[in-house]
Amino acid sequence: MNPPADDMPARCHSYLQQFEAYMQSERQLSAHTVRNYLYELQRGRELLPEGIDLLNVGREHWQQVLAKLHRKGLSPRSLSLWLSAVKQWGEFLLRAGAIELNPAKGLSAPKQAKPLPKNIDVDSLTHLLEIDGNDPLTLRDKAIMELFYSSGLRLAELAALDLSSVQYDQREVRVLGKGNKERIVPVGRYAIDAISAWLECRRQIPCEDNALFVTEKGKRLSHRSIQARMSKWGQEQALSMRVHPHKLRHSFATHMLESSADLRAVQELLGHENLSTTQIYTSLDFQHLAKVYDNAHPRAKKQQDK
């Protein structure tokens, strides 16, 4: 639906109709997307200064509109949609020869804040890892979860492990990470014990290859199967949040930082290319420190009434 034309110059209205047709036919955008673009153009037009319309708008005008929308409380996602609409409008007018420069080119919305990953607290993780049973699947799943939490591996890294990947005497695991970069990661005693218990069962399974973690039929365990089994155990152990591999990786990183505060060491353990990727966990760690401060510092909270 086009913006109302009662107070819009006929030339501008004509270009809007052409823009709508161009989006639908040449760009082959969905009707929903086209409607959104037209709505966003109308939203921006209503905030333009008097005497400025969609054909003579300048970069400074769009900057002012962007600031107004931001002050109105629009989310970064909504601002990005608005910017996409006005940029497409400018590109269309350029192609049509109506303007010489796209006034929206180069404008950017505030970055969307990345949600902090949620970790599982130590007590809940301990409860999760206390699964009981001596059947092969339980022993295998326990070894998988112990290793995830012990070493902070990615799902793909753990699924790709072979029998030769774990060095039991040194308590280390050789991991092939992103970009085929190899790293050596320590493995805790509980994880080593759990893997050893699983291997006693694995030896009884005819296997197609040297995969460390296999199905009952001897095939390498898939990513999806690992995720499903972990989700199952989270439900059976009555955890308050859904359990998945990346959550154990987050928990590993957070708990390591809570204990050591050695950001670069955690970066190496996680296999992060850049330190900035690891720094997100400092936000989580600060949340923990803030709670400790509030509970422990004598002047962090009001004293009880005497």
Swiss-Prot record:
The keyword DNA-binding is assigned to this record: yes
Q: Which GO terms describe its molecular function?
A: DNA binding; tyrosine-based site-specific recombinase activity
Core-binding (CB) domain location is: 10-94
Residues annotated as domain Tyr recombinase = 115-294
UniProt KW keywords: Cell cycle, Cell division, Chromosome partition, Cytoplasm, DNA integration, DNA recombination, DNA-binding
Give Gene Ontology CC terms: cytoplasm; Holliday junction resolvase complex
Q: Which domain of life is it from?
A: Bacteria
Localization per record:
Cytoplasm
* Active-site residues from the entry: R154, K178, H246, R249, H272, Y281 (o-(3'-phospho-dna)-tyrosine intermediate)
Q: Which CDD domains match?
A: INT_XerDC_C
GO BP term, example: cell division
User: What PROSITE patterns does this protein's entry cite?
Assistant: CB, TYR_RECOMBINASE
PANTHER family reported in the protein's UniProt record: PHAGE INTEGRASE-RELATED (PTHR30349), TYROSINE RECOMBINASE XERC (PTHR30349:SF81)
- HAMAP family associated with the record: Recomb_XerC_XerD (MF_01808)
Q: What does this protein do?
A: Site-specific tyrosine recombinase, which acts by catalyzing the cutting and rejoining of the recombining DNA molecules. The XerC-XerD complex is essential to convert dimers of the bacterial chromosome into monomers to permit their segregation at cell division. It also contributes to the segregational stability of plasmids.
What is the annotated quaternary arrangement, including any partners? Forms a cyclic heterotetrameric complex composed of two molecules of XerC and two molecules of XerD.
The text of the family note is:
Belongs to the 'phage' integrase family. XerC subfamily.
- State what protein this is by name: Tyrosine recombinase XerC
Q: Which organism is it from?
A: Shewanella oneidensis (strain ATCC 700550 / JCM 31522 / CIP 106686 / LMG 19005 / NCIMB 14063 / MR-1)
